Amino acid sequence: MNKDLLLSSYDYTLANELIANYPTNPKEDARLLVFDRKNKEIFHTTFKNLQDFLPNCAIFFNDTKVIKARIYGNKVSGGKIELFLHQPFLNSHNPLFLAQIKGRVKKDEILYFKKDLKIRVVELLNDGLRKVQFFQNDKTLDTSNLYNLLDKIGHIPLPPYIKREDEKSDLKDYQSIFAKNLGAVAAPTASLHFSETMLENLRKKHEIYHLTLHVGAGTFKSVECENIQEHKMHSEFFNIPQQACEIIDSKQAILGVGTTVTRTIEYYARTKTKSGFCDLFLHPQNPPIRQNHLLTNFHLPKSTLIMLVSAFIGREQCLKLYELAIKEKYRFYSYGDAMLIL
């Protein structure tokens, strides 16, 4: 079988010391590895110098906003419960949500949280997932009311590889400066590097566009089948404004900031769907057909994200750059350094 289709072909070893538990401060001082595909050139610089390397292109950002999706409560017996909200079921008659619950629960069990919030376990699903319903003062909560309540009692859902509790600093650090549409349970991390000053400078030379893709917990889901074509990609809600669609439909060069932007642009390029659910899986045998350049962080081994990067530059080249980044002590994952692919 073609090695590009084998899960084991996307593996690498990373020392724990290179996993960033906090962002660089100031954030634009993060390091940036630049790879020019045309000339096969590699540059090591800092993120604040990004504009020095950018060609004439439109820049697309994901303006999703991370909700405080992790809450702690109790069973009626007093046993502790941790719930991680994934997403709403948009087509259900009653407001129902998909959630992951740590702790054994039964169907129809009631769980108790702060601010008189109660949860009824509606259905037990696979992989520790549960279909749940939220109540406050015995009134069913819809998505908007739930998100408002979570803002008061919830915790920022840091990724599983950050081995610490969320802190006050994460409220700002794990949210992009242009985040506005609530619904993500993970940040589009390439966006986290941008400061207001950097954004202002970019606007002077580049057209800036926003789209929304609510990053789901599936972004952390590991690929488990050796033939990656058998992997069932997670689905996430997206919306693209008309003006952004027109740029995608044009021949204007595009820089996508982050893998979520890439998947949204490429889904639209294939389907002409402006709003819906994106489950596009990009890899070397299913490469991008529209986006020209990519800005992204360094991703987990054997993840769909490293496969997406490989779709741009080839699997072997991707692994070589990761090997170089490890040698040069770049910081990895959500709070880590960045890579620009031209």
UniProtKB/Swiss-Prot annotation:
The keyword DNA-binding does not apply. GO terms for molecular function: S-adenosylmethionine:tRNA ribosyltransferase-isomerase activity. Keywords: Cytoplasm, Queuosine biosynthesis, S-adenosyl-L-methionine, Transferase. It catalyses: 7-aminomethyl-7-carbaguanosine(34) in tRNA + S-adenosyl-L-methionine = epoxyqueuosine(34) in tRNA + adenine + L-methionine + 2 H(+). It is found in: Cytoplasm. GO terms for biological process: queuosine biosynthetic process; tRNA wobble guanine modification. One of its GO terms (cellular component) is cytoplasm. Its main location: cytoplasm. It comes from the Bacteria. Pathway: tRNA modification; tRNA-queuosine biosynthesis. Transfers and isomerizes the ribose moiety from AdoMet to the 7-aminomethyl group of 7-deazaguanine (preQ1-tRNA) to give epoxyqueuosine (oQ-tRNA). Monomer. Belongs to the QueA family. This is S-adenosylmethionine:tRNA ribosyltransferase-isomerase. It comes from Campylobacter jejuni subsp. jejuni serotype O:6 (strain 81116 / NCTC 11828).
